[in-house]
From Swiss-Prot:
It comes from the Bacteria. This is Ribosome maturation factor RimP. It comes from Treponema denticola (strain ATCC 35405 / DSM 14222 / CIP 103919 / JCM 8153 / KCTC 15104). InterPro entries: Ribosome_maturation_RimP, RimP_C, RimP_C_sf, RimP_N, RimP_N_sf. Keywords: Cytoplasm, Ribosome biogenesis.
Length: 148
């Protein structure tokens, strides 16, 4: 799995403070231009969980900002929670799950590791499994699930 800085994800740095101001973490932001329409998908989480009203609130806050950043009002936007057993698509998502349970396929042992994500950095993460801290570099992570 490759690590991409938050600042390198288009519009993430501009949107993250708005989402955090509403009391949520921005897990992922995906902005695609298809034909004449921009498609935006935002994934948010909160310690209390995420409901439809939360998604609506974030949508109403982010939509005008995204439109201004892109320079277009032809934007469709979807805001959702990570859901249960979130399949991690980008290593940067691990930041949102520090302190939570994860299941990680570790290529170095060709098996799943289970534990609590203790620390995340640009090289890898520390997983606490059976009271033992295990350093797992992103290059050894084939896939991962969080929010178990």
């Amino acid at each position: 799995m490759e690590f991409i800085q938050k600042k390198d994800i288009p519009y993430f740095s501009e949107c993250e403070p708005l989402v955090e101001g509403l009391g949520f973490k921005l897990v992922d932001l995906n902005v695609l231009h298809k034909k004449d329409v921009w498609q935006v998908k935002a994934v948010i989480k909160s310690e209390k969980g995420v409901g439809i009203k939360d998604c609506t609130s974030v949508h109403r806050t982010l939509q005008p900002r995204i439109e201004a950043l892109i320079g277009s009002q032809d934007v469709t936007m979807e805001v959702s929670s990570p859901g249960i057993n979130r399949l991690v698509k980008r290593a940067v998502e691990f930041y949102a799950f520090v302190g939570e349970e994860a299941q990680i396929w570790d290529n170095s042992i060709t098996d799943w590791r289970h534990g609590i994500i203790k620390e995340v950095n640009s090289e890898g993460l520390v997983l606490n499994s059976d009271n033992q801290d295990i350093q797992i570099p992103y290059q050894d992570i084939k896939k991962a699930r969080c929010n178990l």
